C-alpha cells in the first residue's frame, strides 16, 4: 500500500453509480487503487442530462474505471430487488474473492415541493421514495454484510441527505426527508450489529451538490436564496462528497462507526 493508492487490493461496490455523485464515488475509489463494481438500474442514465453526458470519458463508468487501470464490473440492477442485488454481490465475491467496501448511494426523490408536504403527500409517492432510499439501502447492506461478516472486516457507507436533518421552509419533500432520516438511523443500528465483526458502518449526508442533473434545478430555484443558508457560500461538488467517502473507505476511519457526517457547507447547522 502506498500513500497514493491507499485502497490497493481492496474491492468496492457502489450503487447508483452511473452518473452524478455515485460516479464520483466510484472513480475516486478506483483512483485510490480499489477494484470497483457498480450497480445502477441504467448504466447509461447519464445520457438524460447534458452536463452529465458531456463529462463522460467512456460509454459507461465501467469503462472509465478500467481506463484508470483498475478492474471493473457493471450490473444493471434495481436495489429494490433483493434477489438481483444478492446475485450481483455473489458474482463480485466469486470473481474477485472478497468485498471490502460498499457505498450505498442509490436513491432519489419524486414529486414537487408543493405536493410532497407532510399533510398531503400521497401514498404512491411515499412508497416509491421509501423503496428507493430506505428499502434499497437495507437490501444493499444486508447483501454485502454476508461476505464482510465472513471476512470479519469491511467498510459500509450509506448516503443520507441534509433533508433528513433539516426541514425546508415550505415543508416540502417530507417523504424524502423522512426516508433519509430513517437511512441515518438504520446506519447506527447496523453499526452496532456489525461492530463485533470488524465492520464499520457510517453515513454521509450531502447538502446542495451541483451535479449535472441538479445544477440547472438549483439555479432555477435561486442561487442567492439557497446559498444564503450555506455558511461556506457555495454549492458542493461531487468531489467534495467523494473525499469523505475516501476517508470512510480507508484505514484512516478504522475507529469511526455509527457516524452521520454532513457534507453540506454548514447548511444543516445554519
Curated annotation (Swiss-Prot):
Belongs to the short-chain dehydrogenases/reductases (SDR) family. The active site is at 176 (proton acceptor). InterPro entries: NAD(P)-bd_dom_sf, SDR_fam. It is found in: Cytoplasm. GO terms for cellular component: cytoplasm. Keywords: Cytoplasm, NAD, Oxidoreductase. Homodimer. It comes from the Bacteria. One of its GO terms (molecular function) is oxidoreductase activity, acting on the CH-OH group of donors, NAD or NADP as acceptor. Its EC number is 1.1.1.245. Activity is enhanced by the addition of Ba(2+) and Mg(2+), but inhibited by the addition of Al(3+), Ca(2+), Co(2+), Cu(2+), Mn(2+) and Zn(2+). It catalyses: cyclohexanol + NAD(+) = cyclohexanone + NADH + H(+). Induction: Induced by cyclohexanol. The keyword Metal-binding does not apply. Catalyzes the oxidation of cyclohexanol to cyclohexanone. Can also use a broad range of other alcohols, including trans-cyclohexane-1,2-diol, trans-cyclopentane-1,2-diol, cyclopentanol, hexane-1,2-diol, ethanol, 1-propanol, 1-butanol, 1-pentanol and 1-hexanol. This is Cyclohexanol dehydrogenase. NAD(+) binds at residues 19, 40, 78-79, 105, 176, 180, 209, 211. Its main location: cytoplasm. Optimum pH is 8.0. Stable between pH 7.5 and 8.5. Signal peptide: none annotated. Gene3D superfamilies: NAD(P)-binding Rossmann-like Domain. Rapidly inactivated at temperatures above 40 degrees Celsius.
Amino acid at each position: 500500500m502506498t500513500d497514493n493508492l491507499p485502497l490497493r487490493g481492496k474491492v468496492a461496490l457502489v450503487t447508483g453509480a452511473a452518473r452524478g455523485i455515485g460516479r464520483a464515488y466510484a472513480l475516486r475509489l478506483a483512483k485510490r487503487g480499489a477494484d470497483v463494481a457498480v450497480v445502477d438500474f441504467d448504466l447509461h442514465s447519464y445520457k438524460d442530462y447534458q452536463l452529465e453526458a458531456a463529462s463522460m470519458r467512456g460509454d459507461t463508468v465501467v469503462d472509465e474505471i478500467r481506463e484508470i487501470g483498475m478492474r471493473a464490473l457493471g450490473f444493471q440492477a434495481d436495489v429494490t430487488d433483493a434477489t438481483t442485488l444478492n446475485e450481483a454481490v455473489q458474482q463480485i465475491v466469486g470473481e474477485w474473492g472478497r468485498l471490502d467496501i460498499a457505498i450505498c448511494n442509490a436513491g432519489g426523490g419524486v414529486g414537487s415541493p408543493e405536493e410532497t408536504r407532510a399533510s398531503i403527500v400521497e401514498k404512491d409517492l411515499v412508497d416509491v421514495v421509501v423503496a428507493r432510499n430506505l428499502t434499497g439501502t437495507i437490501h444493499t447492506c444486508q447483501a454485502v454484510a454476508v461476505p464482510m461478516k465472513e471476512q470479519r472486516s469491511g467498510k459500509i457507507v450509506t448516503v443520507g441527505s441534509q433533508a433528513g436533518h433539516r426541514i425546508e421552509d415550505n415543508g416540502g419533500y417530507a417523504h424524502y426527508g423522512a426516508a433519509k432520516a430513517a437511512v441515518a438511523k438504520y446506519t447506527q443500528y447496523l453499526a452496532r450489529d456489525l461492530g463485533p465483526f470488524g465492520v464499520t458502518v457510517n453515513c454521509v449526508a450531502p447538502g446542495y451538490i451541483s451535479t449535472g442533473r441538479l445544477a440547472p434545478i438549483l439555479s432555477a430555484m435561486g442561487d442567492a436564496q439557497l446559498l444564503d443558508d450555506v455558511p461556506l457560500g457555495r454549492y458542493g461538488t461531487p468531489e467534495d462528497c467523494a473525499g469523505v467517502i475516501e476517508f470512510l473507505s480507508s484505514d484512516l476511519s478504522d475507529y469511526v462507526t455509527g457516524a452521520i457526517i454532513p457534507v453540506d457547507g454548514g447548511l444543516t447547522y445554519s
